[in-house]
Amino acid sequence: TQIEIDLEQLKMDGFEISNVFADFSSFRSIIQLNTLNADLFGGYADVTGLVNLQRNIPRSELKINLHKINLSSMLHSITDNSDTNGSLNMDLNIAFNGIDLENLLNSAVGSGAISVMQPLYSEINLEQTLCSAVTFLGGSRSSKKWPTGTLLQDLSAELEVQSGSLMVRELISGTENIDLHLHGAVDIRSRDYQFLLKARLKDPSNAQDSCFNKLSKNSQDIPFTCRGNMSAMSPPICFPDIDVLGGVIKNKVLSDLLRKLSDL
């Protein structure tokens, strides 16, 4: 049996999909998705896969490719939050068992890769946040005037899905002055996330701002633990690794307080 579906436009909850074409075939309780193409969020998606109904619990396997997706539009539809922009590309192979949402999430396993071209985070300036933390802990302030938001370098990362969590492996990006490496996980059900962000000054010889001078003296990665929720309107809460910052922190009471906060 073979079925083809061709739709000019499909309205979903909060967004629209256009130019939808799907080709299904079935044989001996296996439904094959030969192709599913659609335009969405300013880009397009290609999906192939199958559903195996030969056992008591159905098993599904999908290969998902997203191309040139407008990240701001997608996040606004999913989380009502559009503070991150860029052009998203993603390849993901995923498999799961069952038919209800809870079983699908709990059994999902997969892997893939993601890249974002010209990423922009409008909520905070990451360099300013890092400088504020380092200079405050060192008992001084940065006099630099900072632009709003953070324009990042093109980023890439490896993805893994397991037990209801989306794990991000070795996300690599950076700003004008700082290299950034990040890894962590997002709980798909609660949308809570926690990441370890490591920042390193690119070229200490160009460290003109006081906070960058402090970083250049350390000449090592500065780790931050960041926590938040993808549905929240506020930016993530990030705490620096007190042991690494060690010599920068002059106030013992403040150091002890930050240790307690970072352990919460």
Task: List the model feature ranges, each with a label.
Residues T1-I3, S25-I30, H67-H76, E160-S165, ...:
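Flexible, solvent-exposed coil segments and beta strand-coil junctions
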Residues T1-S26:
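Elongated, acidic membrane-bridging lipid-handling scaffolds
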Residues F15-D23, A38-T48, H67-I99, L105-S111, ...:
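Amphipathic hydrophobic-ligand
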Residues N81, E127-V134:
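Flexible, surface-exposed loop regions and adjacent strand-edge segments
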Residues I99-A108, S142-L264:
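Extended terminal
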Residues S122-L130, A207-F212:
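Outer-membrane beta-barrel and related beta-rich outer-membrane complex signature
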